[in-house]
């Protein structure tokens, strides 16, 4: 009898939560729509959020600009989009993808764990907008149509598909004296595949999602060095949820970090080893110093947030205390 009572109580409690749940719209950008990884991760997130009294209606978008426009016109309570798009609404969280700032997934886990804690809320909750969740979609790698383009010097003069709203990437391409070919998420893959550009950059999932193997052909390759750690971030108007719900959302999203990383690793491991190009340590050192100089310049231009740059430098130096940057006078 007691077991029956407990079961009935649990069932009634579940119905009570469902009955009083507040319905909100979560608009998700995923290039593959409802079949994509990001959409399905966020479907699971929505299930987990029901315990907080929020019932999300999750809607897929294959055009990121449309998803952002619908959010700004209040058709969506929350939008899930790349940090590169969301940086203008929260420079702190957008700095997670700063060039070369997070060289490994171990360090990325530490960064995201730190940002999910309550102490970070003051940086993520703004007067108008808030970030209520972040999850990884993988390191951005250079896809090159010639695998011998593996040093900084060899990139000079090459045509690089560059997202037209990504100020740090435009700065970097100009810095190495390459040619910016303005692009967006919908067409960068096509430009690489038809030879309009020599180089593009993206996480590993794009290899199949955008069929980048067509652009790699027989001589191309993927430089096995993370340019940046790309994430999907959940943006909402601060007054949409109370502070406790916003924080719980961030914690729930981070609790799914392993799930997201398993997908990232699945995509990276699915790419034939013949495409990967490993750098010499001397070239890695050049990339790291070049990225560091760019981050300092972009901090001065107020594109990157100095507080998060410092946090990420401390995490890097904890992982590699002998790195030259850790003792420099101009360290981040």
Regions found by a protein language model. Give the residues of each.
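Sec-dependent signal peptide recognition
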Residues: 1-9
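Bilobed "Venus flytrap"/periplasmic-binding protein-like clamshell domains
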Residues: 22-52, 130-194
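Structured segments of extracytoplasmic/periplasmic soluble domains
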Residues: 48-52, 70, 74-78, 82, ...
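Contiguous mixed-secondary-structure segments that line small-molecule binding/active-site clefts
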Residues: 82-175, 226-331
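Glycine- and acidic-residue-rich phosphate-binding/metal-coordinating active-site segment common to enzymes
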Residues: 179-218, 223-224, 230
């Amino acid at each position: 009898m007691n077991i029956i009572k407990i079961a009935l109580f649990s069932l009634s409690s579940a119905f009570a939560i469902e009955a009083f749940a507040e319905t909100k719209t979560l608009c998700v950008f995923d290039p593959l729509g409802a079949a994509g990884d990001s959409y399905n991760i966020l479907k699971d997130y929505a299930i987990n959020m029901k315990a907080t009294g929020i019932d999300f209606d999750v809607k897929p978008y294959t055009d990121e600009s449309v998803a952002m426009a619908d959010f700004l016109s209040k058709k969506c309570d929350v939008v899930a989009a790349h940090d590169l798009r969301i940086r203008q609404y929260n420079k702190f969280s957008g700095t997670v993808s700063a060039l070369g700032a997070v060289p490994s997934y171990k360090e990325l886990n530490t960064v995201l764990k730190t940002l999910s804690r309550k102490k970070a809320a003051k940086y993520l909750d703004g007067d108008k907008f808030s970030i209520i969740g972040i999850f990884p979609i993988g390191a951005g790698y250079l896809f090159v149509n010639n695998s011998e383009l593996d040093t900084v010097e060899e990139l000079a003069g090459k045509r690089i598909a560059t997202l037209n709203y990504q100020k740090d990437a435009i700065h970097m391409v100009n810095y190495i004296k390459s040619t910016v070919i303005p692009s967006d998420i919908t067409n960068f893959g096509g430009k690489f595949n038809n030879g309009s550009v020599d180089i593009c950059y993206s996480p590993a999932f794009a290899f199949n999602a955008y069929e980048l193997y067509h652009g790699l052909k027989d001589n191309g390759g993927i430089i096995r060095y993370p340019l940046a750690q790309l994430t999907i971030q959940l943006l909402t108007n601060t007054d949409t949820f109370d502070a406790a719900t916003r924080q719980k959302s961030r914690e729930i999203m981070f609790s799914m970090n392993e799930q997201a990383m398993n997908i990232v690793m699945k995509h990276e491991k699915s790419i034939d080893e013949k495409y990967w190009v490993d750098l010499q340590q001397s070239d890695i050192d050049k990339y790291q110093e070049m990225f560091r100089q760019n981050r300092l310049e972009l901090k001065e231009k107020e594109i990157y947030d100095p507080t998060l740059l410092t946090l990420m430098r401390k995490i890097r130096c904890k992982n590699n205390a002998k790195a030259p940057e850790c003792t420099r006078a101009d360290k981040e």
